[in-house]
Amino acid sequence: MKKSIYEKMQILADSAKYDVSCSSSGSDNNYKTGELGATHNSGICHTFTADGRCVSLLKVLFTNHCIYDCAYCINRKSNEIKRAAFNPRELADITINFYKRNYIEGLFLSSGIVRDEDHTMRLILKALKILRQEYRFNGYIHVKLIPGADEKIIEEVVSLANRVSSNIELPSDKSLKLLAPNKTKEKVLQPLKYARDISLEKETKPIGMSTQLIVGATPENDKDILKLSSVLYDKALLKRVYYSAYIPVNDDKNLPAVITKPPLLREHRLYQADWLLRFYDFTYDEIVNDENPNLDEEVDPKTFWALQNLQYFPMEINTVSKEELLRIPGIGARGVYKIIKARRFKSLDFEDLKKLKISIKRAKYFITCKGKYQKEVSFYKETIKEAIIKPPKKKIIQPSLFDMDYSAITGEL
């Protein structure tokens, strides 16, 4: 029976929700009858551009038919699920109509593999050509490249898209062989290498590229994951690595049970560590190593690093370099800028930092101001960590309805 456009949209938007390269919510509160609003992470989602703008995207698969049988994927060949596929004209028409109604500002397009990699990529390319050349659509387009597709097809897709990606999914070749035998790391990364080389040859602004790693489906530790991310960044292959806490959708002896909860906190810590790699000049083996191969879920990665390296602390806030300031837990790039600017005129103390609107809730355990260290806890790893995890409870004071000092003087309420 032929499916309507509405049915196809329902199926293919829902099938795309597990790709976190574009997602607007980590919540699973679904729509309830009689209530307003929902937090679905499928359909229209949000992402951020390089200049910080938040854009709404239609997040959808071209098709959820697939010749692959990856154990972790809801769209695997052996799963008995509802299947659908757009044709290029249908997808282009939906996108342009959503855009004209101001529902979206762009398109996030992924796909299962139908027939073979080249055939699927050609269908996607045809949809992009209709959008860009026929409809003159100049909005944002993010396309998932199909590993194994021909280089010439990829070149055309890259010329029409704003961002491309190819998901590695699993951090090691061993796990890929076990759970996704049709894929290898080299095969997945090859389209991104093509895209990078094409951008460099044309001497234009390099196209943004990203990948996704699933966290918690296989036994790899955080060191394995961050090492891979670091290598990909160092090779200038990627602008961003996304981490996706594994959501069990299939029963498989090689995967966690379906009732297993996604490791969301671990995913969050990996994103924080990834930020340190990209913007704070940390190396992966500074954050995690053979002795501590996994991040501490109780504290953020910068605090975790600081607690393992107390020999560098406490740092004197008035004399240390910009690079050293960036390594102090709780002080970010904007805080460092404020400190460097302010200390040109005076030596700073703890009160000065508060006046600069710099939170010292964590930083105070790792710094001195004018040679003075905070007196709340002793300078030991265990006591500092405990103080950070379990801060002292503040005494709750009932706020007064009136300004008591003013009332006492004037007699007014």
Outline where the language-model segments fall.
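Flexible, acidic/Gly-rich N-terminal and inter-domain linker regions that tether
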Residues: 1-65, 359, 367, 375-413
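Conserved, mostly hydrophobic/aromatic
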Residues: 57, 70, 109, 166, ...
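Canonical Radical SAM [4Fe-4S] cluster-binding loop centered on the CxxxCxxC motif
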Residues: 60-89
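Long, highly charged, low-complexity intrinsically disordered interaction regions
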Residues: 254-326, 362-413
